[in-house]
């Protein structure tokens, strides 16, 4: 088993409103949604989701985060943990909508870059 394709990329921004205008209105990247009460905006660039966010708490702060799609987030997390990967959190739901629930769990590569596993699961 291996992680799937990159499904999402996170870019830290200093001004979310200005960045949304730039990516949506100047570059024309299709806007998906903002998270109410959170400094986050999401776009769809072909098969890859782009996540713009104002820096988070220190343990999650990173200039870039790669998100890897997986068909079973729990099994893949267990496999990677068996390979010595230390996770920063447990798999958890980050968004619910008509398409289902978006689950994530975060870890780091050897240089400290943030990586995540993602899975869209049926709502329920």
Report each predicted region and the residues it spans.
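Short acidic/glycine-enriched loop/turn segments that link adjacent beta-strands
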Residues: 36-39, 60-61, 98-101
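Conserved beta-strand in the GNAT
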Residues: 50-53, 115-118
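Core segments of cupin and vicinal oxygen chelate
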Residues: 4, 10-50
């Amino acid at each position: 088993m291996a992680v799937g394709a990159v499904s999402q990329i996170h870019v830290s921004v200093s001004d979310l409103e200005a960045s949304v205008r730039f990516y949506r209105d100047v570059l024309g990247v299709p806007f998906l949604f903002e998270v109410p009460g959170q400094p986050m905006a999401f776009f769809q660039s072909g098969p890859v989701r782009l996540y713009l966010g104002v820096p988070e708490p220190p343990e999650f702060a990173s200039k870039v985060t790669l998100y890897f799609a997986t068909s079973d987030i729990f099994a893949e997390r267990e496999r990677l943990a068996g390979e010595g990967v230390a996770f920063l959190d447990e798999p958890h739901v980050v968004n619910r909508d008509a398409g289902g629930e978006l689950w994530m769990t975060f870890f780091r590569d050897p240089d400290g870059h943030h990586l995540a596993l993602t899975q869209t699961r049926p709502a329920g």
